[in-house]
Amino acid sequence: MANILRKWIESDRRELRRINRLANRVDSYQDQMAKLTDDELKAKTPEFRQRIQDGEDLDHLLPEAFAVAREGAKRVLGLFPFHVQVMGGIVLHEGNIAEMKTGEGKTLTATMPVYLNALSGKGVHVITVNEYLSERDAEEMGQLYRWLGCSVGVNGAQKSPDEKRAAYACDIMYSTNSEIGFDYLRDNMAVYKEDQVQRGLNFAIVDEVDSILIDEARTPLIISGPGTGTSKLYQQADRFVKTLKNEDDYKIDLESKTVSLTDEGIKKAEKYFNLKNLYDPENTALTHHLDQSLRANYIMLLDKDYVVNDGEVLIVDSFTGRVMEGRRFSDGLHQAIEAKEGVEIQEENKTMANITYQNLFRMYSKLAGMTGTARTEMEEFREIYNMETITIPTNRPVARVDEPDLLYPTLESKFRAVVKRIQALHEKGQPVLVGTVAVETSEYLSHLLDQQKIPHVVLNAKNHAREAEIIKNAGQVGAVTIATNMAGRGTDIKLGPGVKELGGLAVIGTERHESRRIDNQLRGRSGRQGDPGLSQFYLSLEDELMKRFGGDRIKNFLQRLQTDDDDEDVVIKSRFLTHQVESAQKRVEGNNYDSRKNVLQYDDVMREQREIIYRERQQVITEIDSLKWVLMPMVKRTIQRAIDAHTLGDKKDWKLQEIVDFAVEVLVKPDQITVGMLEGKSKDEMVDLMMDFAEQVYEEKKHQLYDDSQMLEFEKVVILRVVDAHWTDHIDAMDQFRQSVGLRGYGQQNPLVEYQTTGYRMFEQMVADIEYETTRLFMKSEIRQNVTR
């Protein structure tokens, strides 16, 4: 283990030395660029573009182009990127992750690789976690890019298709991750080329890359249409589930956050719903609703996993603490929570298009990211996204003091100690940022501070609209701010006058998050750019992480403590416990990684299918002459399948009447074909005969429509209508199959292998259905003028 660690550290140092040498080459142009007039500096952009056209590559151009962007930033923004920021920029240009501590100027760091890559004309996307940051960064950094002759656009949910198209056409575009994904899906549902907004996914720099590519990796982006109504079943399931008693009727596995009925619970369900066997295949819909109701009532917590606002259930992102607007839990869980909370149950939707962030961002030709905390997830970034994580040195040494964790026996004693510490810090004027994991905790702590008459503000999912303003004031003398995980990522907490002398910003964590990275983010709010500061976590043996993963050793430890000492406020400082906390976090991180990897393996099946359908669709949409080359092979394969199906065994057993019936249904008028015309022919001869009929029908349609453009429009209408209808049905069927395939693991079958093989068969069947339906629609439809989609 020690050897592996040594090799790691050594390879890191080697990589930093290489990057440092390249940054020195950028430095070497500093004086030369400083001597240029504004016009001469601006003229570098068209010069670089010409050199790229003449064959020079971006890597060769890097030292000079970075130096131009750097000098431009000094003149336009009044900011000159430090040497370490140049190093960060090199990491980004090379398609890797730059881990830079809070306050080290990630936004300015990105300007150099953004400018260099924008010169290629293929488009650079800067991805942020919310629209506020997109607008802010595009406004501030856009001044520099425009001054240097690059166009800048902002993409947003409220933009019209024309505005979006214009933004994507720019050299540089700022956008949220979700909007890029939804635009991709909408583009692949469009029926006209002119309705599409994107122009390929070339290079993206993802800000807060861990938040988007790790925390949100499992969240699929879904475009839905209306589905079938089942709200009564949710209400019935909810009423039943609320009658159950813990341990007797259901059991909860805290570690995996799952809940299931016991044998007693199953008997109660069979009696309640008047069934002989709850798990009979006929009762699949009911068991699905019961499973979701159990999760809603006994796993999902109000004000932690979701909030209820104006009669609507809204998801709270467990990593950021923000409300996820417009998102709904999938698989009917959202409806089950609506039934639990007694609000209106919105109908389940049918998925029409979906993609995960993992597969969306892997489609970029080059992907880079920056964050203050990626090191703990470096293996995942390497394995899934093929990105290395490089830790960039800070410009000034970190002066923050990270004090060791304090552990208390109970939640109550822990919060008493937290309030006491806040009071002491507040009395001397030192600003305090208190991090909580849940909305509920932030409100409980707020209540305790009110009792002590300590003025404070709360930042959680219920008031996130004031986020930037609250965070901006969190570094002033005497400020006390309670924040859930969101803690204003992307907004620096700047220290007010006199705060440095008081010791800087004090960060107090009220419990460890299941991810070490989130804890590090909270610590990183303090001590920016060499400022002083302190951080400390207050834990209790009743914290959720300890309950889920602490195990019997901790319980025994707690019992010994309580018998040895009746004082609830005793502070436990034990290496054993600190080690237990960290190993618990590593276990959760490992579980989460396995889960994300599992999601990716399943989603890769859909990715391959999605790419085939979207590629074929795009060929149809962009065709400008004729689609006969797409249509007639579909017709031929449909004919071959039908003839193969009815010509099994000896020739005397061939079902020629069925072939005639097929031809009448799909290709020709009833009087055009008889059994006699097929007698004595081989399979290939029958296929040729049918294809002759198909050619005749095709030419007739072409003649009826007079105009080649009308014929092309008719071909597009038929193909797209059929493909879209079958594809959305297929997505829905694959979704349902994926939910049920887990049960097959009990039959000694690997659920993933089962999903892959059956999914492939389902896809092949869908393609055959599309070709059959397209053939029938095209060949048998009556032509009317004014073809519309």
Swiss-Prot record:
GO molecular function: ATP binding; protein-exporting ATPase activity
Reaction(s) catalysed (UniProt annotation): ATP + H2O + cellular proteinSide 1 = ADP + phosphate + cellular proteinSide 2
Annotated SUPFAM superfamilies: Helical scaffold and wing domains of SecA, P-loop containing nucleoside triphosphate hydrolases, Pre-protein crosslinking domain of SecA
The entry's keywords: ATP-binding, Cell membrane, Cytoplasm, Membrane, Nucleotide-binding, Protein transport, Translocase, Translocation, Transport
Annotated localization: Cell membrane; Cytoplasm
Cited Gene3D superfamilies: Helical scaffold and wing domains of SecA, P-loop containing nucleotide triphosphate hydrolases, SecA, preprotein cross-linking domain
GO BP: intracellular protein transmembrane transport; protein import; protein targeting; protein transport by the Sec complex
Chief location of this protein within or outside the cell: membrane
Annotated PROSITE patterns: SECA, SECA_MOTOR_DEAD
Binding site residues for ATP: Q85, G103, E104, G105, K106, T107, D492
EC number(s) reported in the record: 7.4.2.8
Cellular compartments per GO CC: cell envelope Sec protein transport complex; cytosol; plasma membrane
Entry keyword Cell membrane: yes
Membrane topology qualifier: Peripheral membrane protein
Pfam family, one: SecA_SW
InterPro entries in the cross-refs: Helicase_ATP-bd, Helicase_C-like, P-loop_NTPase, SecA, SecA_CS, SecA_DEAD, SecA_motor_DEAD, SecA_preprotein_X-link_dom
Assembly information from the UniProt record: Monomer and homodimer. Part of the essential Sec protein translocation apparatus which comprises SecA, SecYEG and auxiliary proteins SecDF. Other proteins may also be involved.
Known function: Part of the Sec protein translocase complex. Interacts with the SecYEG preprotein conducting channel. Has a central role in coupling the hydrolysis of ATP to the transfer of proteins into and across the cell membrane, serving as an ATP-driven molecular motor driving the stepwise translocation of polypeptide chains across the membrane.
Assigned protein family: Belongs to the SecA family.
PANTHER family hit by this protein: CHLOROPLAST PROTEIN-TRANSPORTING ATPASE, SECA INNER MEMBRANE COMPONENT OF SEC PROTEIN SECRETION SYSTEM
Protein name, entry field: Protein translocase subunit SecA
Natural source organism: Limosilactobacillus fermentum (strain NBRC 3956 / LMG 18251)
